[in-house]
């Protein structure tokens, strides 16, 4: 009964950071979510993402982990978020590697990140994917279509020009705002 969250005023979100380039997006999302007192975050970081944090940032992985309320090893298939009985409001995978995308759409729940997405899908919870690959091949596109057919929300981290945001930070904030909107959250940049 501890797992059920239906009466709670707290939003529970699972955040997955996979091994695609762009792990900074996941870090920034966690920073924003940390500022909300009514959001509980559950974090899974893949081994590839840990490598990318070392390659792409100067952050120590401990700095990333401390932003989440709970963090889990990717091989921990006994974690709370691996069970449909543990109620969440959904999941964001940012960035989402093509390997992770393929695992999700083909039900290959070999690790906690994939299992958590699988649970959210089977329980009809929102799954937001932020795929990071360029150019996209036919297999990538087919997998993205399949993800959309499974009701995943696809938010590619694309450059936008209509809002005159020209710095990288402004572009990142715009993408994060789009992610947060999926959960009814406003982000004041």
Q: Residue ranges of each PLM-predicted region?
A:
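Short, Lys/Arg-enriched N-terminal segments with co-localized hydrophobic residues
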Residues: 1-10
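A cross-family phosphate/adenosyl-ligand binding-site feature
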Residues: 11-128, 134-189
